[in-house]
Structure formats: structure tokens, C-alpha cells
Regions:
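Short beta-strand segments that buttress and anchor functional surface loops
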Residues: 75-78, 189-195, 236-237
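C-terminal segment of N-terminal export signals and the immediately downstream linker at the start
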Residues: 6, 27-61
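Active-site-adjacent core segments of small-molecule enzymes
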Residues: 47-50, 54-92, 96-109
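Coil-to-beta-strand transition motifs
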Residues: 108, 225-228
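Edge beta-strand at a domain terminus
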Residues: 234-300
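Predominantly extracellular/secreted and cell-surface proteins with exposed
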Residues: 84-220
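N-terminal export signals
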Residues: 2-6, 11-33
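Mature extracytoplasmic/lumenal regions of exported proteins
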Residues: 219, 227-238
Length: 300
């Protein structure tokens, strides 16, 4: 007999927290360096080795430098890690809508995310999924998550709320300059979050993510360029979602994915757009209006 596997606030927290926590922590941190290695004659450019400039660069790479919309997509595969052995579970296609607004002391980001689960290595939407470790077949239910608004200080640090989608959580993260090579710049975003889904006395849902974001250096340091396309890769280690019904099996979920950030909604991956237009046509038809709706409620 099949059970229901809700793609809900409790089992999308890995992807979502990684996205929401991009750029959080005590602040953006440029790499330690005695002096900027940028060639002379670039006066007026942002310096990635200066803390204030790096906060601006970080905002541009993660979102955009001015007010408006941007969009991110992610293709990933989820694995079960049990006794050092990886078992593919399924793949996923995620898309996120971001609206950025500058505030008096920083900026705020409103996010709406939509994830579709697919068969491993394909774009085929899953209506049910067989857990290879338990043998149980789980029916899939899907829904958008958000919109949720988070506030950032001018230095790039997040004003952490006390709850996330109605659940108490604790989080920390860092965003730092990883490397500059030629006309490429890389940032590392490491985040760690614990979501107390069953109250403070029960083990939390634990999300650890390592994200790498890459963009063109010339775009990043240009103070007149607020729209910097970027690519990203992520690796996550998460607790079992409750809805996987893993029982007493000891292990973790591993997610490996790649994606990008763009500024034209119609240039999101075609497979994701096709699913969104079929299943959530209201979001596809008017992404701006979707960001103004009341956040959907998801329960197991």
C-alpha cells in the first residue's frame, strides 16, 4: 500500500534553508590579503578585499545590487548515506523567485520556491516514489513554499528570525571570498541550521550546506553593474525527513546539485517552466503577483 510523501515545509527545508541562508552569519568576509591584487588603473572599481565593497559584491552575486527581481534554478540528486554507502533516491528541479528591496539599514529579500521531484537522472515528474532502503512506496504531493521575507543588514548579515515557516530554528553561516583567477571570482557560502520540528526536547532536523558561487570578476567589481549572472554548485548533508519514514535506520540525506542565477524568468530551465505552467499556472503567468500572496501552509 502506498503512503503519502508531502513535499512540505518539513522536507523541503534542506533546499530552502540553503537558499535563504546564502549570505548569512556575522557578515561577508573578504579573504585575508595584504593588498588588493587587482591591476592598477582600476580606481573606482569595487575591491573584493575590502569589507564594505565585498558586502556589495556578495549581494550582487547572490541576488542583485539594486531593487528588483532575480531568479535561481537548481538541478540536484538526493542520495541516502548509510554506513558510508550512497544510494540514489531521486532527482529534483527547483526554481526560486527573489524580490530585493533596499531598506534604510540594508535590504530585504522575499523568496518563493517551487521544487519538483523527478526520477533519477531524468526530467520525468514523479507521482510516487519507492524508497529503496525500506521498500515502501510513497505518493508525492507538491506545493510552492513561501513567499517568505528575510532582512539583511548593510554588511550582508541576516537578521535571523526566531522561527522559520512556523518552526523554531538555530542557524549560522559564512560567506567568504574563495578565489580570483583571471576574470572569474568564486564565493563560498557555508551554512548550518537546526530546525526543531518536534519541539525543543526532540532531535532537530539538521541541515549543513556548502555552496560555491561563481561569476565574472569584471561584472562583480563594476559599481555600475547591478545584474551579475552567476553559477552555483551545492552539497548538503541533512537529517532524514520525517516523511521518508526511515524508522531506526541510521544515516543522512546527501544532496549534490548545480544551477544558476538569472534575471529573465522566461530563461529558467525549460523543463521546470513546463512543469510550473502545467501545475502552478498562476505563478508562471505572474511571478510578481505570486510574491505578494500569503505564504501557503504545509502540514504532514
Amino acid at each position: 500500500m502506498s503512503s503519502e510523501f508531502h513535499v512540505s515545509r518539513r522536507n523541503t527545508l534542506g533546499i530552502l534553508l540553503g537558499g535563504f541562508l546564502a549570505g548569512t552569519g556575522a557578515g561577508f568576509a573578504p579573504a585575508a590579503h595584504s593588498a588588493s591584487p587587482l591591476a592598477s588603473g582600476k580606481k573606482g572599481s569595487l575591491d573584493p578585499y575590502d569589507a564594505d565593497d565585498f558586502a556589495v559584491i556578495g549581494r550582487k552575486l547572490l541576488y542583485r545590487g539594486d531593487d528588483g527581481l532575480c531568479f535561481a534554478w537548481l538541478k540536484a540528486t538526493k542520495y541516502a548515506l548509510v554506513k558510508s554507502s550512497l544510494t540514489p533516491l531521486h532527482s529534483m528541479e527547483s526554481g526560486a523567485l527573489f524580490r530585493i528591496r533596499t531598506t534604510t539599514d540594508g535590504y530585504e529579500v522575499t523568496t518563493l520556491e517551487r521544487t519538483f521531484y523527478t526520477a533519477v537522472g531524468t526530467d520525468d515528474l514523479l507521482d510516487e516514489w519507492r524508497n529503496p532502503l525500506t521498500g515502501e512506496t510513497l505518493m508525492l504531493k507538491r506545493g510552492p513554499v513561501g513567499p517568505t521575507t528575510l532582512k539583511y543588514r548593510r554588511d550582508g548579515s541576516l537578521v535571523l528570525p526566531e522561527s522559520y515557516l512556523g518552526l523554531h530554528f538555530e542557524a549560522k553561516a559564512s560567506t567568504r571570498l574563495a578565489n580570483i583567477q583571471g576574470d572569474d571570482i568564486w564565493l563560498l557560502v557555508d551554512s548550518d541550521a537546526k530546525v526543531f520540528r518536534n519541539g525543543p526536547d526532540e532531535p532537530p532536523f539538521h541541515v549543513t550546506e556548502m555552496r560555491t558561487t561563481q561569476a565574472r570578476l569584471s561584472d562583480a567589481i563594476d559599481p555600475q553593474n547591478n545584474l551579475v549572472p552567476a553559477s552555483l554548485s551545492i552539497h548538503e548533508v541533512n537529517s532524514w525527513p520525517e516523511t521518508m519514514r526511515m524508522g531506526g535506520i541510521d544515516g543522512s540525506v546527501i544532496i549534490r546539485g548545480f544551477g544558476g542565477k538569472i534575471f529573465d524568468f522566461d530563461k529558467m530551465p525549460g523543463s521546470w517552466l513546463a512543469k510550473l505552467r502545467r501545475i502552478n499556472p498562476d505563478i508562471a503567468a505572474d511571478p510578481v503577483a505570486a510574491l505578494d500572496k500569503t505564504a501557503a501552509k504545509f502540514e504532514q
